[in-house]
C-alpha cells in the first residue's frame, strides 16, 4: 500500500479495527445462534412444531436479512460505516432482548426479523472497511480473523446458552428479577443486554477510513455509487463468473445452516442428552473446528499469487463440497454422541474455510463503489437461501415425512448431500468461465491485473 494509505492507518490501529469487527461478528452469531440450543424448551413452552422452529431459525430470518441487507448495502457505500455498524448492533441487541420477552410464535418471529435485518450490515461493512485500510495481501487474513469471530460467537451461543439455561432453571437463579419469565427467556435477556459493549467500543475507539480503489490505492474514490440495478446487471448479466460463484456459495451454506440449526436437537432427541450436555459437546467443537478451518484456509492462500488467487479459491470451494458430501452422508449411521460430534466438527471446520475465502474474489475484483452492495448481495443470498432453505427443509421433511421423530440425522444428511452436490456443479461452472475469460482477455483487461500485483507486492 502507498505511504499515504499507510499513514492513515498504522498497523496497530488497523489490527484493532479488524479484531473489534471480529468481536462484533461474534456477538451477532451469539444472538442468532442461541436459538439452536434453546429449540427444545421453546418448542415445549410455546407449543411449536418443527416447521415453525425451522421458520424461526431459517426462512423468516433469511427473508428479513435479505430485505434489510439491500438498503443497508446502499448505506454502506455512501455513509459512515463505523456508525452504521454500531447502530445495527444496538438494534439487534434490543431485538434479542425482545425475543426474551416473547410469549408466542408471532412475537418471537417479529423479534427475529429485527435481529436479522440489523445483522445484515456487519459483514459487508467490515469487509468494505478492510479493503480501504489494508494492503491487498493482508485482506484475506483480515477476512479470516473477522470470520473467526463468528465461530467464537456461535460456539459461545451453544455452550453459554446451555449453561445459562441450566443456571436459570435452578433454585439458585435470581428469580426475583422478572420471575414470570421462563429460563430460556432469561437467556435471551442476558445475551441481548451484553450488546452494549461492542457498540461503545466501536464508537469510542475507531474511525472511518477514506474510500480507496483496490487497483489504485492512491486514488480517492469520490464518484457516486451506482444504483442497485446496475450492480445486479454487472454481476448477473455482464459477467458470467459471479452468478454461479455466488449461487455455489449459497448452496454450500444450505449445508452448514441445515446442520447448525438442528444438530443440538439431533443430539437431544437421538441420544437423550440435556440442552446443557449438548451445548458442552457442540460449543467447543464449533469454536475449535471453525477456527482451525479458517486458519487452515490461510495456509492455502499464502501459496497463491495475484494471477491465480481467484481460480484457486474456486477450486478450494469445490473440494470442500466433496468433503461435505462424504462427511454428512455418514451422519445417520453415528452410534454415539462422540461420533456425531466428529461429523459436526468436520462440517463446521470446512465451513470455516469457506467463510474465510468466499468473499475474497469479490473484494479483489469488484469496483469500490459496487463493493459494499456486491458483498451484501452475496451475503444476503447466503442467508436467504442458506439460512432460509436449510433449517426449514430439514424441519419440514422430518415432520411431514417422518412424523417429527428421531430422524433428524437422516433429514440433515439428505438436504446436505443434495445441496453440496449442486454447489460442486456451480463452482465447476464458475471456474471454467473465469478461466475462459482470462484466456480471452487482453493483459490489461484481466481481473487480477498487473496493477493489483503491484499493490500486493508493495
Positions of predicted regions on the chain:
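Helix-loop-helix hairpin linking two adjacent transmembrane segments in secondary transporters
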Residues: 146, 150-204
Amino acid at each position: 500500500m502507498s505511504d499515504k494509505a499507510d499513514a492513515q492507518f498504522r498497523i496497530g490501529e488497523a489490527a484493532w479495527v479488524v479484531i473489534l469487527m471480529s468481536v462484533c461478528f461474534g456477538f451477532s452469531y451469539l444472538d442468532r445462534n442461541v436459538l439452536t440450543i434453546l429449540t427444545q424448551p421453546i418448542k415445549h413452552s410455546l407449543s411449536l412444531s418443527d416447521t415453525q422452529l425451522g421458520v424461526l431459525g431459517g426462512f423468516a430470518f433469511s427473508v428479513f436479512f435479505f430485505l434489510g441487507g439491500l438498503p443497508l448495502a446502499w448505506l454502506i457505500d455512501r455513509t459512515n460505516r463505523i456508525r452504521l455498524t454500531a447502530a445495527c448492533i444496538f438494534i439487534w441487541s434490543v431485538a434479542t432482548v425482545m425475543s426474551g420477552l416473547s410469549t408466542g410464535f408471532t412475537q418471537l418471529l417479529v423479534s427475529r426479523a429485527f435481529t436479522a435485518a440489523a445483522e445484515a450490515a456487519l459483514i459487508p461493512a467490515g469487509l468494505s472497511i478492510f479493503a480501504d485500510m489494508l494492503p491487498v495481501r493482508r485482506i484475506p487474513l483480515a477476512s479470516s480473523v473477522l470470520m473467526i469471530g463468528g465461530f467464537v460467537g456461535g460456539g459461545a451461543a451453544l455452550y453459554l446458552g446451555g449453561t445459562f439455561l441450566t443456571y436459570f432453571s435452578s433454585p439458585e437463579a435470581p428469580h426475583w428479577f422478572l420471575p414470570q419469565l421462563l429460563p430460556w427467556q432469561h437467556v435471551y435477556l442476558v445475551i441481548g443486554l451484553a450488546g452494549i459493549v461492542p457498540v461503545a467500543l466501536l464508537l469510542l475507539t475507531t474511525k472511518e477510513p477514506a474510500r480507496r480503489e483496490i487497483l489504485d490505492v492512491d486514488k480517492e474514490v469520490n464518484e457516486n455509487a451506482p444504483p442497485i440495478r446496475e450492480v445486479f446487471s454487472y454481476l448477473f448479466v455482464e459477467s458470467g463468473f459471479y452468478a454461479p460463484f455466488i449461487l455455489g456459495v449459497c448452496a454450500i451454506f444450505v449445508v452448514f445452516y441445515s446442520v447448525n440449526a438442528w444438530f443440538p436437537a439431533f443430539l437431544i432427541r437421538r441420544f437423550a442428552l440435556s440442552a446443557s450436555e449438548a451445548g458442552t459437546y457442540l460449543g467447543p467443537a464449533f469454536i475449535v473446528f471453525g477456527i482451525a478451518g479458517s486458519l487452515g484456509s490461510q495456509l492455502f492462500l499464502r501459496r497463491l499469487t495475484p494471477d491465480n488467487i481467484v481460480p484457486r479459491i474456486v477450486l478450494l470451494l469445490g473440494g470442500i463440497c466433496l468433503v461435505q458430501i462424504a462427511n454428512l452422508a455418514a451422519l445417520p449411521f453415528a452410534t454415539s454422541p462422540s461420533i456425531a460430534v466428529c461429523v459436526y466438527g468436520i462440517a463446521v471446520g470446512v465451513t470455516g474455510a469457506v467463510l474465510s475465502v468466499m468473499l475474497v474474489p469479490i473484494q479483489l475484483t469488484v469496483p469500490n463503489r459496487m463493493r459494499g452492495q456486491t458483498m451484501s448481495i452475496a451475503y444476503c443470498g447466503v442467508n436467504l437461501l442458506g439460512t432460509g432453505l436449510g433449517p426449514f427443509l430439514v424441519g419440514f421433511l422430518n415432520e411431514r415425512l417422518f412424523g417429527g421423530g428421531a430422524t433428524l440425522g437422516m433429514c440433515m444428511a439428505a438436504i446436505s448431500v443434495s445441496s453440496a452436490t449442486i454447489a460442486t456443479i456451480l463452482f465447476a461452472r464458475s471456474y471454467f468461465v473465469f478461466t475462459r475469460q482470462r484466456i480471452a482477455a487482453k493483459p490489461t483487461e484481466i481481473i487480477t491485473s498487473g496493477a493489483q500485483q503491484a499493490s500486493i507486492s508493495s
